[in-house]
Amino acid sequence: MRDIIVLGAGIGGLVTAVTLSRAGYPVTVLEAHVYAGGCAGTLYHKGFRFDAGATLSAGFYPGGPMDLVAQAAGIETWHGRPTDLAMVVHMPDGEMIPRWADERRQHAYQDAFTEQSMPFWHWQEKTVDALWDLALRLPTWPPQTARQAVEVISTGLNWTSADLFHRISPGLLADVFRLVASQLHRAPGRLRQFVDAQLLISAQTTSENANALYGATALDLPRRGVRVFESGIGSIAARLV
């Protein structure tokens, strides 16, 4: 059996390496930095810890991405503190708007942006729920064999039938080609500012340039099992090393 070399000890590289190792393959991970985790790493300087990039992590819910990672890596539990308050956004006028994971988020949106903003949030949540449902079915993409192609088609049909009228709707298909801004044209200006601030962090662009499906997903972090790691985001990589 040949050795497998994984380039980079970011989260993707570490998950790949530990999964292959548990499957019986000899694996070597090559990393240029002195710490693992990549942009989800924690570095040390003069006795202090600094997160390299992200300070929050999501996906820690039953059946979620990090739950699947834990199963693949043989990790019984992630040592992070769950939180319903993912972040507080400070607006230019001084108002602080919380982003809750639970039903409080709806009240926060109405208080900050009025009822006029709710169609946008309903679109965002409905859209991203459909996308996560598809992604967590783990379709093989792109398919490499005829068998895999059949499996992808079967997965797609099962996903479509789970919410037929929404998932074959012209709106969802059109969002493949539209921008987030197309869903904000009737929304309050402050809402666009609020959305753009978060997209700049999670999608590295604003609603005028972010694809609608990608942007809806990028805005969904508070609802996806957020955890805070007391010793830094690099704790995730440490569990995988």
Model regions and ranges:
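Generic solvent-exposed, charged/amphipathic alpha-helical segments
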Residues: D67, A238-V241
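N-terminal glycine-rich phosphate/pyrophosphate-binding loop and immediately adjacent elements
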Residues: R2-P139
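Active-site/ligand-binding neighborhood in enzyme catalytic cores
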Residues: E125-R239
